[in-house]
Every structure is written in structure tokens, then in C-alpha cells.
Amino acid sequence: MADDWDTVTKIGSRVGGGGGGGPRLTTIKNKSQLNAAQRAGGIVGTEKKYGTANSSRSEAGSGQFLTKVDRSDDIVKPKTGDKELGMYIMQNREQKKLGNRLEFGKKVGINEKDLARIEKGEVPITQDQVNRIERGLEMFIRGVKKGEPKVKTFKRAADKK
């Protein structure tokens, strides 16, 4: 009974050391926190968390692609571009005398090597690249309007009323 007088009873939801009884897991943000945890003798696990949001396509999708290859019995070809589309771009670039790949690439903002690989059909073309090339050629290169001129239409403030 004497022990009851020496202990303090705490009432409330935020009282206590939490559940589990073990040390709490925390994420260490910098080197000084890591050193402090090591000096305190805590269990320290240093594992890098790899995000795929900002990494390139070849690194991000390689695991998924290899899984697809492992599960299939036949040969799985990597994704390639459309050779017909590449030839169409090259023909129109030369027909309109927009210069060689280097000059045209600078005009539309695509690297010369990337433009060469697109024209050869080695890589799939992205929508951003399609838009840039269409602006440079001033014509549609895909879809229902393929070959039609891509004309900029401006509406004046007076016409909108």
C-alpha cells in the first residue's frame, strides 16, 4: 500500500511513452542526426530510398521490362519508333528546305542526335517532340489532319465580342 503513495497516476490521452516498448523509428534527414544516433547506440539502418519520378526512362522501366521478358516464352522486342513517320518528317524537312538536321533541330529545340534517331525510327517519339516538329514544319505529321498545313489562328479582342 505504501507503493501507491509514491507513484503518480497520470490521466489523459497524451500520457505515457507510447506503445510497443521499443525505440521509435524516425527518419534521419542529415548527417548530424545520423552521427547523434550512432553515438547514442541506437540501431541505425542506412538505406537509400530510390524514387523513379525524376530518373530516366531506361532506368525506371527496366525492371518492369525485364519481368515482362522473363514471363514470356517468345521474343519480346523493345519499343521502337515509327519508320514511316521518320521518313515523312525527313522528306518534308528536305522538301521545304528547312536545312539539315542540325539547323532544323536548333529551330525546333530538339537535339540533332535525337532528331536523327526519330527519323530513322529507332526510338518512339514523344508528344512534346511531335508538337515541336509540327511547329517547325508548319504542318500536321500525325492523325486525321496528316499533311495539312498547321496555320496559327489569332482572334482579336474585337472579334471575340
From Swiss-Prot:
Residues 14-23 have a biased composition (Gly residues). CDD domains: HTH_XRE. One of its GO terms (molecular function) is DNA binding. Residues 90-144 form the HTH cro/C1-type domain. It comes from the Eukaryota. Residues 27-36, 52-65 have a biased composition (Polar residues). GO terms for cellular component: nucleus. Keywords: Activator, DNA-binding, Transcription, Transcription regulation. Residues 1-66 are annotated as: Disordered. Residues 101-120 bind DNA. Pfam families: MBF1. Transcriptional coactivator that stimulates GCN4-dependent transcriptional activity by bridging the DNA-binding region of GCN4 and TBP (SPT15), thereby recruiting TBP to GCN4-bound promoters. Involved in induction of the ribosome quality control (RQC) pathway; a pathway that degrades nascent peptide chains during problematic translation. Required to prevent stalled ribosomes from frameshifting. Belongs to the MBF1 family. This is Multiprotein-bridging factor 1. It comes from Pyricularia oryzae (strain 70-15 / ATCC MYA-4617 / FGSC 8958) (Rice blast fungus).
